[in-house]
């Protein structure tokens, strides 16, 4: 990490390239079989319709071009910026970090808690993004994707990217390790696919399939004002905004919407 004590184009460009390659491979491995070759048709697809060929709502009039633009032009660079700043802070000694050999139990504990912290951070940020002003200037870009696909995952306005990836700042505050910060950002960057793939499962063959997507978040894209969080911490159950697709909770949602409009 010695070279990371100062900002330089060399190591920064290496991290940016790595994130571009990893992100592109990851999302493409899901997108191509499901949305290009359509290897399983609409089997296990939440929305039986495919994205329209021409969609004036989207940048460049097409959902996939829109998603690629916001993800690659803004998403990956902002993800990388947070990683670069984190590594520079560690390498320059501006924040301390713990080695695995010093406290392996604490090291693993932080690693295990990152998904839970991300769940809480995502819920809080997501509620803020649904404030009228924030939705208008930023979050509306992401919510164009009523029928999301894998590349919709990081298709966000840069203001939303800044908030979405800001959870890594916790590692600037608590004692952790550069690997924790990197894992945290990968969990946010690649983990964003959960809930945006649009399919419950991907078929491997006639007998086997792998679970893919979070129906909970698909319903958020469909109804907007439900399921602000994920499922690890039940914030939506606690605050009355949960929807699981059942008729009972759908009716509760409609009643809530009616009250809010009066």
Show which residues each predicted segment covers.
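Functionally important transmembrane alpha-helices
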Residues: 174-231, 238
């Amino acid at each position: 990490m010695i070279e990371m004590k100062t900002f330089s184009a060399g190591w920064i460009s290496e991290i940016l390239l790595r994130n571009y390659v990893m992100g592109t491979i990851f999302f493409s491995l899901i997108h191509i079989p499901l949305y290009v070759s359509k290897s399983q048709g609409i089997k296990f697809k939440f929305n039986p319709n495919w994205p329209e060929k021409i969609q004036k709502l989207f940048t460049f009039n097409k959902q996939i071009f829109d998603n690629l633009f916001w993800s690659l032009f803004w998403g990956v660079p902002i993800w990388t910026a947070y990683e670069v700043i984190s590594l520079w802070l560690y390498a320059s000694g501006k924040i301390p970090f713990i080695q695995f050999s010093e406290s392996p139990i604490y090291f693993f504990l932080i690693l295990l808690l990152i998904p839970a912290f991300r769940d809480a951070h995502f819920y809080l940020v997501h509620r803020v993004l649904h404030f009228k002003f924030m939705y208008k200037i930023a979050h509306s870009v992401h919510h164009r994707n009523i029928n999301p696909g894998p590349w919709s995952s990081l298709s966000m306005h840069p203001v939303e990217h800044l908030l979405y990836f800001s959870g890594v700042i916790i590692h600037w505050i608590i004692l952790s390790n550069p690997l924790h910060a990197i894992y945290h950002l990968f969990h946010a960057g690649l983990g964003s696919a959960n809930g945006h793939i649009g399919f419950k499962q991907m078929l491997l063959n006639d007998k086997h399939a792998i679970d893919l997507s979070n129906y909970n978040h698909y319903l958020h894209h469909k109804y907007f004002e439900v399921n602000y969080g994920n499922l690890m911490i039940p914030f939506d159950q606690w605050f009355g905004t949960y929807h699981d697709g059942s008729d009972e909770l759908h009716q509760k949602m409609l009643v809530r919407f009616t009250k809010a409009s009066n």
